Amino acid sequence: MVPIFLKIFFYGFSTNKSKLSEGFQSEQSNNIIENNFHNLFHGNFNTNFLNNNNNNNNNNNNNNNNNNNNNNNNNNNNNNNNIIISSPILSASPSLSPRFQDILENNSVSINIQSSISESPPNSTDWQLEKFDDSMGMISSVISLREQQQQQQQQQQQQQQQQQQQQQQQQQQQQQQQNQQQINLQYQNLQEHCPQNQSHNQSHQQKQNNSTQIPLVQNNQQNLETFSISILDENFNNSGILSMFGEKCKKPKFPHSSIDQYQNLPSDIKMIVENISKMSNFSTQEEIVSVTFKFAFFLTNLSEKTLKILHDSISIFNKIEDLFFQIFLPQSNLIPEIYLKEYILNLFSHLCEREHFLVFNTLKLPLNFMFLCRSYFESFDRLDKIQQNQQLQIQQQNQQQNQQHYNNNNNNNNNNNNNNNNNNNNNNNNNNNNNNNNNNNNNNQQQQTHLQQQYHNYNNNFPITSINIQQQQQQLQPIDIQQLNINNSQNNQNNIQLEQPINHQNQNIYQQFQQFPNQVPSNQNLVGNDIFDTSIITIPQNNISSSQPSFLQQSPPLTHHPSSTQLVNNNLYQFDSNNQQQFQIHYTSPSFIGALASINNNNTTNNINFDNSGNTTTTTTTTTITTTTKTSNNHNSNDNVIINPNGSFLHTIPQEYRTKGSKINLSRKINKSPKGVISPKYRSILPRFGFKMKDLEERSNINGENYIRSRKGVATLINTYLTPISAEMSTKRESKCGVVICIKDHDQHSSVSIVPRLYPMSNGSKDGVEKFVFHKNVISIVCPGVFSHSYSVNRLDRNQRGFFIRYSFYMGKEEIDYVHTPIIRYKNTPSDFDQPSRVLLGHVISLHPVTQNGIVAVKFIAISNLLKKGLITKNITTSTSNLINNENNNENNNNYNGNINSNNNNNEEIEEEEENNNSSGGSSEDDDSDSKVKATRMGKPLEIILYEKNLQFHLTIPQHISKVNPEDKWRFPETLITETNDPKKSKNSSEIIHFVSSYLIEFACIIPRGNYEIIFRYENVNKTVHPIYYSI
C-alpha cells in the first residue's frame, strides 16, 4: 500500500515534470522572460515566476534522487534547500536571443527558494512512513515539527537574502558605474559622427528592454494593429553587420497579415522600400516586409521634400541594409514617436553631405550605437528646456529694454515739459520786459514833451546867455529811443540764449538738413553736379569740431559732400570756400577710402589731430626720402624724388595696405588725379554701374596676385583693376599707371631708399649683359609711404620676350627687403598688343527717350588692364619712292629704338609720325601724276561687337562715329554719346568710345534688351579674342 503522502508527492512531481518538459522553449516562457528582462537587468525580477520554476526544478531533482537511490537528497539538505539560479541557466535555452544571453551572463541573479522537503536526519522519512501505518496520530506531530523547522529556516533564509541583496546592490552599483564610464567614452568617440553634435553631458541609463511590441503609427487616420516580433534562431546569419551589442543582427519577422497592409501603402513609400530591397539580400516578399514594414509606415507621415531627400540618399549607400538595421531598428523602440520623424529628416539631410565618411565609421565602429542615439534623443528635452530658458531670458531682456525705453521716454517727456515751462517763463519774462519797455518809452516821451515845453517857456521868460544855454542843453539832452529799444532787445536775446533748451538747436539742425535733396540726380551727366551718396558715409559726433556748421553736428540719413571733397587717410576733409576750414568726417567703408595728398616745398607735414572736445592740435614733422635709380649710360638719370602735385592713388588702395604713421595735411586744394588713374569723383560712381569692390580688387595682371607683398612684409605692390600693373609694354612707351608701392610702416622706414632693376623673363642676365634698360625711370612720392614709379623700357636683346622689375629697399647701405612685379610682356609696337581678354563691364539705363518697346538707351563702363586708343584708318596720297622709304623707316623704327619722344602719349606719337609722313609725301607734288599712288594708313582702333543670338541682333561699336554703318547711326544720338561722367574732359561728339584713363572707357548706344555676347578687339589685328556674356 502506497502511502497517501507519497502519492501526493509523486503527483506533484509528475505535474512539474510535464511542465518542465516544455522548458523555456514555449512561447509563453519566452514572453515572460523577455518581458521581465529589463527588471532582471536592474535587479527587479518577478520572484513568483522564478519561485515556480525553481520549485519545478526542485521537484525534478527529488524525482531523480528517488530513481537514483536518493543520492541527491543529501545534496539538497547540505545546501540548506537554497537553489541559486544564475543567468547561464537561462542562457542555456536555445530560443533566447543572443543579446539577452549576453546580458544574463554578465549580470547573474541568485535567488533563494525554500524547498518543499524539510531538513531531517537520515531515514527520517522511512521512520515517519512506518509510524504512519501504526498510528495516524503521529502525522499531526510530524506536521507541527515541520512547521517549527520551516519557521527557523525561513528566518535564516531571510537573513541570508538580506545579506545577498546588499551584496548584489553593491555589485550592481559598481557595475553601473563601470558601464557608465564605458558609455561616456563611447559617446565621446562617436560625438563626431552623430547626425547632430549635441554638447549636453547627460547621464546614460543601463541597457533597457528592447520591447517585442512595436506600435505602428496611424496611416490615413486608421489605427494599425500591433505586431510582435519573434526572434529567429541564433545560428541564422543575416549579412554580417554589427549589431548594437557587437553580434550578428537578427531579422524581425511580421505575421503574414502585414503583407496585405503593405500593398495599401502609397507608391512613393513602395518605391523607397523597393530601392532598399534591391540592395539587400532578401529573397521573399515576407522578408522584405519584415525589415521595412515599420519604417514604411513612418514614411507615410513625411513630407514630399523629406521623401525626396530620403529617396535620393538611398542610392548613395552601398550597405543600405546594414545602415537600416544599425540605425533605425535598434533604437526605434526607444525613440519617442514625436522625435522619430524629425530624426529621420535630420539624419538623411546630414548624411547627404557626409555620406561616405559617416556611414563608414558608423558601420565599422564596434560600439553600442543604441545608447548614442538614445542619449541624442534624450537631449531633445534638454534642448527644449534650454530654448525655453533662452526665450525667457530674451523676454526678460526685452522687458528690461522696454522698461528702460519707457523710463527714458518718461525722462525725455519730463525734460521736454521742463523745457516748455522754461520757454513759457522766458516768454512771460519777455512779454513783461516788452511791457516795461513800452511803459518806459511812453514815460520818456511824456517827459521829453514836458521838458521841451518848460524849456520853451523858460526861453520866453528869461534872457538867453551862452552859459545858460549850454548848461540847459546838458541837462535837457533828449533820450535816443531807438537805441534804448535795441539795447533792450539784445538783453532779451541774451536771456533767451542762456535759458534755451537743448532740443531747440536739434530742431534747427533737422530743419536745415531737410533742405538737402533726398536722392541722386537722375541726370547721368555729372559734370558740375554734386554727388549725394547715401550708403558709405556716416558722421560720428565725437569727430566733429565745435567750429563746424550746425547741420554737421548730427548724423543725418543722407550725407552731402560737394565736388571739392577730398579723401585723405581714412578721413574725409571738406574745404569751405570762404575760410578754408577743414572738417573731419569718418569714412566707414575701407574699400572706398581715398585721398588726395600733397607735400609743401619744405617737405614738412602738418598733422591735424581732432580730440573729443573739438579742439585741434597741429604737429609738424620733416621727412627725408632718398631714391636712387639705375639707367643706361646713354640716358640721363634723375636721382631726385619728384613730389607729385596732381593727387594720389590712395582712393584705389584699401585701408589695410595703407601706410601707418604720420599723415600729411593738404596745403591747397587739388582737383586733378595722376595721369592714368581715375579721379575719386569718378571712382564714386562705379557702384551705380554695378561694379562691386570684390571684382575691382581682383588682379589685373594675371601673372601676379592682386596685392604682392614683399619677402619680409615691408612693402606691397598694388595690382588691381583700379591700380593695375601693365601686362604689356612696347619700345619706350611710358606706362601710364606705372607701379604703386606702399610702405607698411612709414615711421619705421621714413628714410627708405627704393632701387628698381630690370630682369629678363628668361633669366638670361647671368652673363652680366643687360637685356633691358630704363628709358624713363622716375619714382615720385604721393604721400609718406606711398610711391608711384613711372617708367618706360628699351630692349637691348631682341630674343627677350618679357621682363619683371625688382624693387630693393635699403636703409642706408643695407638691403632690408625686396619685391618683384609680375611678368610684363614686351612688344615691338603697341599694335602688337594682344586683344583685351579680361574685361569688367557695367551699365546703367539712360533716360534718353526711346519710342520702341523693348529697346533701351544703355551707357557702359568697361575696365581692363590696358585699353589702347588706336589711330583711325585713313587714305593718304604719296609717291611710290617716298612710300617705300617711309615703310622702310617705319620698320627700322619699330624693330629698335624709334624716334618718338617718350614724354608724349601714344596718340601724339602716332599723329606726329603721320604728320611727318604727310609732309614728306607733299614734296613729291612736282613729280608726274603717274608716280602718285593712293596708300592706306592702317590704324588699329578699338571696336566692340555686340551679338544677341535669340534676336539675331548684331552691332559693331567703332571708336569713331565715321565708322558706323549708315543704318545704325540712329543708335548713337549725339545727346547720348556726348554725356560723360569724366569731370576732367568734355567728350567729342564724334567719339563713341571715350577713354577716361588707360584702363577705363565708357560708351553708349540704343539696343534691345537681351543676353549678349560681347567682344572687345582691335581693328586690323588678327589675334584670338575672348568674348564675355552679359545680360541687359
Swiss-Prot record:
**InterPro entries, alphabetized:** Mediator_comp_sub12
Q: Where is the composition biased (Low complexity)?
A: 884-907
Disordered: region residues: 54-80, 391-451, 884-934
- Coiled-coil positions: none
PANTHER family found in the cross-reference section: C2H2-TYPE DOMAIN-CONTAINING PROTEIN-RELATED (PTHR46007:SF12), MEDIATOR OF RNA POLYMERASE II TRANSCRIPTION SUBUNIT 12 (PTHR46007)
Q: What is this protein called?
A: Uncharacterized protein DDB_G0289975
Origin species, per record, is Dictyostelium discoideum (Social amoeba)
